[in-house]
Regions:
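Generic recognition of flexible, low-complexity loop/linker segments
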Residues: 27-29, 256
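Alpha-helix N-cap/loop-to-helix boundary motif
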Residues: 20-21, 28, 48, 148, ...
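A short glycine-/small-residue-rich loop at the edge of a beta-strand within enzyme catalytic domains
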Residues: 24, 47-50, 183, 210
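Residue-level detector of flexible, active-site-proximal loop/helix-junction positions
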Residues: 23-25, 76, 101-107, 211, ...
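Basic, polyanion-binding surface patches
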Residues: 128-295
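FMN-binding flavodoxin-like domain, especially the glycine-rich phosphate-binding loop
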Residues: 1-22, 29-134
């Protein structure tokens, strides 16, 4: 579970140090914690060794008020109760980056997704202030000019095993005739990015002008880690296994062929394998912006 949380954090550009508390030196732990912006801990076994108990104490002693924390059960069958340790962190005035992750059964794909998304939430929490500062420093005339680049409105939906994802997108452009293909820009810290690796399959749902507000509003919500993004939304299953939004104007079934890395996004080139238009006279919804420093 630790690597899944770490992967989610690193998606946001935040660095991660992983430490085995059963063997680390207490002085090293205090130095690492003292320089960190946040700490994530897995629960130790009930019958923890003296060194492990000492090192957990070293973590608590080194924590500072502006740091964030996250806790998860290790599913070893005999973990320490998670709630008492959470209370200790809260009593220190620390902020909880994500809800405690409780693992009652053998970790499933859904649990790993929960861990990944929880890590991403933590990372986004840490870089929020820096992002705001960066946006304020941008050239306003340049951003207004870039904002005149418009695009359609789409919702990407994907499913791999138990794991589902969805994302509202507007940075979409056709990129090839034969085979038919297009590109979509996906922010590195988006949860669905892990479902859009080379060979992965997904659906591009094309929204209709004058009939997109309900779907757009739903998928713009900030979902907590592990939440079902399709609850309350009419869907059917595509031949590639991904959800199709019933109220979309059209849909394309796609397979990721290649990816190009940019500074804060992945440009994902995908080939289209199937598709259908629900309303022949319908027009694609268009998204107009005023500035280019947000979607």
């Amino acid at each position: 579970l630790s690597p899944a949380i770490a992967t989610g954090i690193t998606k946001t550009g935040v660095g991660v140090d992983m430490v085995d508390l059963s063997s680390a030196d207490p002085q090293e732990i205090q130095e690492l914690v003292g320089h960190a912006s946040g700490v994530v801990l897995g629960m130790p076994p009930l019958q923890a060794s003296g060194d492990l108990s000492t090192n957990f104490g070293a973590v608590l002693a080194a924590m500072q008020p502006k740091q964030v924390f996250g806790l998860y059960e290790s599913y070893g069958g005999d973990d320490e109760p998670i709630d008492p340790l959470r209370t200790k962190f809260l009593d220190l005035g620390l902020r909880e980056a994500f809800k405690v992750i409780k693992v009652k059964d053998t970790p499933s794909e859904g649990i790993y997704q929960l861990c990944d998304e929880s890590g991403t939430d933590l990372g986004q929490n840490l870089i929020q202030a820096a992002k705001i500062k960066q946006l304020k420093s941008l050239d306003s005339d340049l951003e207004k000019a870039i904002g005149r680049i418009s695009g359609g409105l789409y919702i990407i939906t994907a499913q791999k095993g138990e794991v589902k994802g969805a994302m509202l997108a507007s940075w979409v452009s056709q990129a090839s005739f034969t085979p038919p293909g297009f590109t979509v820009a996906v922010a590195k810290d988006r949860a669905i990015e892990s479902l859009m690796q080379v060979g992965d399959r997904f659906v591009l749902n094309i929204l209709e002008e004058g009939n997109y507000q309900v779907l757009m509003k739903h998928f713009l919500k900030r979902f907590p880690p592990g939440a079902d993004r399709f609850a309350g939304v009419k869907t059917q299953t595509a031949s590639n296994g991904s959800p199709i939004l019933t109220d979309a104007l059209a849909y394309l079934e796609c397979e990721v062929a290649s990816r190009m890395e940019c500074s804060d996004h992945w440009i994902v080139y995908s080939q289209v394998t199937n598709g259908r238009v629900a309303k022949a006279e319908g027009l694609t919804a268009v998204h107009h912006r005023k500035v280019g420093n947000y979607y």
